[in-house]
Design a protein with these regions (language model features):
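Aromatic- and Gly/Pro-enriched helix-to-coil junctions and flexible linker segments
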Residues: 2-696
Length: 696
């Protein structure tokens, strides 16, 4: 077979994050919480704008006026020379920038990037957190959001009124002192796309749609979904919008109430997602198309170095291993059974699980004995005998393959976080558990692991590993649909696309007509639909507005997912955490630390309007409208090395909170276990325009 060169955009999925500032830093390109060579700083930190890999520090989080900076998703191009069907890991890949000379003698003159962002949340179906993807099984669908708008998700009237679609935007990346942009996703900027020949085609007839009519917009107009820029080497930067919301005005002339955490009719936000494509233009006039990536515009990273026990990477990797034949030496594609002779690498497959367990202490209220136990887990090394460690026999790990009753057992089983889709407690993925089983059986490699990842593949893993997995109710960056095999390009070995790449639906922009919606209701799960995803088809399964979901998913009873109690204790009132690594609950504040001695914890969300009569509502804004307006005041957890020159690198502390007050002395952070009140008081009436918080 002759050698062919293919081009791919990496990361396959990257994340732009909201901020109220015009300023920004760059998406992290290292994996949260993991050791990095030559430094005490662990992975997950974003990168300073205008640099290759310089980590941000405390001073980079906010601008001079105290506004929260945005995180730009940086995309790169890589070339792969393939002489056979592809494999994973490929281990190769050479970055391509403007000015790169290829082995065949061609030189890249410029890169034409096209991105299409959209928000379909208000036109989608309600999210049923207790069911997850199963709410779409057997041809069924949940109730539509905004049912007062007549029709189906494909009805033109609903598409015009409920979908935010500015259309595609194009930008040309060249080599220079400064990059290009911004090119904004607003109504004033003409839609455009690559013409496939090295230029850009304007689309003046593209039917843009934004929320219209009389609207309540508490933090500014919802008039953009973000912007594009390039850097000095022609790489792409995608910036999210500013985390704004808009609500329709009801018949009484007041904003529609926020009545829940996930599905709020009459509300919009500026989250978005969509495909990222690239056309390489060479000095000889020829062009090449790269395999596209996907961008998601989402919540800020409030704890970028705190690793999730189950990350999006763990879920995506598990799906590809067990259902898409990613690594036949690990899992038999014919039977779906793990290969008993496979030996995971300790540093590659085991260490991340142990490290994640240890890092949870910085965002939850663990008692000292639990902190010590988690530290003991993190201290396990590749040379230790598994039988002589605290993890001997995996006694404390909840088995995802076991009798379903085990999912209802809390202490002493780990993780001690809540599950999703009706499961009381979180489990590691089946692939993660297999790695742990092999380690427990002494069937692991103390050095090395699978073949090393290539640089583009490493970006894929790092990007996804910095996001919340496991508990999609509906999630923070993405939802349960990320685990569905049919959203991905599956013929990647033959085409050279590489794994983990979302399949974009082919869109012919030349057919766009003013006044006629261009996008449809789009993809829904558990259907025989292999056309691919349209812009907006990932984010539409998230909460609307996103702030109410972030606010509510803090501390809960197990009955939030089932009617039962913790099977280990029989106590239905014991409280547990939802998203502790991505949505901090209890934190140590850096400014309270004296001589590297930690002070008492405080709630991440604190100050006026946060006092909770019932402990299950701690660390939340009691009025959800406060969450919509004050989300940007929440502090960020950083490692000591990114705070100042004196803080211990072993500490991960909150900095730059702008919430008023030091914390309510009547709402202290008590060490776990703690319980909800047995009989919470009836909710008090709220004025129009607000709603009552409902714990999920």
């Amino acid at each position: 077979m002759s050698t062919r060169t293919v081009f791919r955009v990496h990361p396959t999925v990257n994340f732009a994050r909201f901020g109220t500032s015009e300023d920004f830093y760059l998406s992290p390109e290292t994996s949260a919480g993991m050791d990095l060579p030559g430094t005490r700083t662990t992975g997950g930190l974003p990168v300073k704008a205008g640099t290759e890999a310089t980590f941000i520090d405390r001073g980079d989080l906010r601008d001079g006026d105290g506004r929260l900076k945005r995180q730009a998703a940086r995309f790169r191009l890589y070339a792969y020379d393939l002489d056979r069907p592809d494999r994973y890991p490929n281990g190769s890949g050479t970055e391509i920038v403007a000015g790169t000379r290829l082995a065949d003698g061609r030189t890249v003159e410029r890169i034409v990037w096209t991105v299409h962002l959209a928000n379909k949340k208000a036109n989608n179906y309600n999210i049923v957190s207790s069911m997850g993807v199963q709410a779409f099984a057997d041809g069924q669908v949940p109730q539509l959001r905004n049912p007062q708008a007549y029709g189906t998700p494909d009805s033109p009237s609903r598409l015009k009124a409920l979908v935010i679609d500015p259309g595609p935007r194009a930008i040309i990346g060249t080599r220079g002192v400064e990059g290009e942009g911004p090119v904004r996703f607003n109504a004033e900027t003409t839609a455009a796309c690559s013409d496939g020949k090295g230029g850009v085609t304007p689309l003046p007839a593209y039917p843009m749609t934004f929320p219209s009519g009389q609207l309540y917009q508490p933090t500014g107009p919802l008039d953009t979904l973000g912007e594009l820029r390039t850097d000095e080497k022609g790489r792409l930067l995608v910036l999210a919008a500013h985390g704004r919301t808009a609500a329709q005005i009801d018949e009484y002339g007041v904003p529609v109430q926020l009545v829940g955490d996930t599905n709020n009719a009459g509300w919009f936000d500026d989250a978005a997602d969509g495909p990222v494509s690239a056309t390489l233009v060479f000095t000889d006039g020829t062009t090449e198309e790269a395999f596209a990536a996907w961008v998601v515009c989402c919540d800020p990273g409030y704890a970028p170095q705190i690793r999730n026990v189950v990350s999006v990477w763990d879920d995506v990797y598990d799906t590809w291993v067990r259902e898409l034949g990613l690594q036949p030496d690990l899992c038999d594609p014919a039977t779906g059974a793990f290969q008993p002779g496979y030996r995971p690498g300790f540093e590659q497959h085991i260490r991340p699980i142990f490290r994640a367990a240890a890092l949870q202490r910085w965002t939850v209220n663990l008692p000292p004995i639990a902190q010590a136990a988690h530290a003991a887990v993190d201290s396990i090394g590749p040379g230790d005998n598994p039988d002589r460690t605290i993890m001997a026999g995996l006694t404390f790990i909840r088995n995802p393959n076991a009798n379903p009753a085990e999912s209802g057992v809390g202490v002493p089983l780990m993780p001690l976080s809540l599950g999703d889709a009706g499961m009381p407690f979180l489990t590691v993925t089946r692939t993660q558990y297999f790695f742990l089983e092999q380690w427990s059986r002494h069937l692991f490699r103390t050095t090395g692991g699978d073949a090393p990842l290539g640089p583009g593949e490493a970006l894929d893993m790092a990007s996804l590993s910095n996001c919340l997995g496991g508990r999609y109710v509906p999630g923070i960056e993405v939802s349960f649909t990320i685990r569905q095999p049919d959203i991905y390009i599956q013929d990647w070995r033959e085409t050279g696309a590489g794994p983990f790449r979302i399949k974009p639906k082919l869109l012919d922009y030349t057919t766009a007509k003013a006044g006629t919606p261009f996008l449809s209701g789009g993809w829904i799960p558990l259907r025989d639909d292999r056309q691919g995803l349209e812009p907006g088809d990932l984010a539409k399964f998230m909460a609307v507005p996103w702030q109410t979901d972030y606010n509510s998913c803090s501390i809960h009873q197990t009955s939030i997912n089932t009617a039962g109690a913790n099977a280990a204790t029989g106590n239905p009132l014991t409280l547990y955490w939802s998203w502790p690594a991505q949505r901090p609950d209890a934190v140590h504040v850096a400014d309270d630390v004296v001589d590297n001695v930690l002070a008492a914890q405080k709630w991440s969300i604190r100050g006026p309007g946060t006092f909770a009569i019932n402990p299950r509502s701690a660390s939340t804004f009691q009025d959800p409208l406060d969450a919509v307006e004050k989300w940007d005041r929440i502090g960020i957890i950083l490692q000591g090395t990114a705070i100042d020159g004196t803080t211990s690198p072993d500490y991960y502390l909150e900095v730059e909170s702008r919430l008023e007050g030091p914390g309510d002395p009547d709402s202290p952070v008590l060490p776990w276990p703690f319980s909800a009140n047995p009989s919470p008081p009836a909710p008090q009436p709220r004025p129009h325009g607000t709603g009552h918080r409902r714990g999920r």
